[in-house]
């Protein structure tokens, strides 16, 4: 019997011999990084990364199985999806010590690009059961769809860090992004942050007002940040 006697589902032998399902993914990803020392206190780097794949899937469901009513004379489908993500990152990092000050400046730029391409075909209720061909289904029993998307995000960022005598710390950062998923007048947005900290135990120990056996580390910290993010591709269209 083609049916499992205990449930409304196809017998595994029926599935193996009559239904055919295929899924394949061909994927490639990689990354290349280059770094150059301009001076002892300054280096620049560039990184490129890629992730791409093609996925194909097909289904052939035989007639008279445990299927939707409209699929009782069989169903076939073929789907292909292509995806590509590529990123570029450039950074310049400068770090130097001036007396009791440690200073660091990071500047950079990045670009991300994502592309997708999807196509889907489906046919059902064949004129000749189990003859899997799109020509074997009427116009009303076929469906073809295709969708392609492209998204690009470009960003520029910077961060300045300073410390004094391992006691006072200040960090200021900012980033501006330009995205293709927002309207032209709003596609640029900036989000900064600032933070500071004071290691009061270091100051008290330097003044001789605190024994590290009583308290060896204490820090006060305050920060403020603004967050920015774009949206998915075509999500603003109705």
Regions found by a protein language model. Name each.
Residues 135, 185, 191-193, 235:
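Outer-membrane beta-barrel domain signature, especially the mid-to-C-terminal portions
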Residues 89-94, 193-205:
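Short, well-ordered amphipathic alpha-helices
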Residues 50-66, 71, 111-126, 182-186, ...:
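Outer-membrane beta-barrel and related beta-rich outer-membrane complex signature
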Residues 43-45, 102-106, 169-171, 193, ...:
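Residue-level detector of the transmembrane beta-barrel scaffold of outer-membrane proteins
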Residues 41, 97-103, 167, 201-218:
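Short loop/turn motifs that connect adjacent beta-strands in outer-membrane beta-barrel proteins
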Residues 12-59, 77-97, 104, 116-118, ...:
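Outer-membrane beta-barrel transmembrane strands
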Residues 1-14, 59-75, 117-144, 237-238:
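Surface-exposed loop/turn segments flanking beta-strands in extracellular/periplasmic regions
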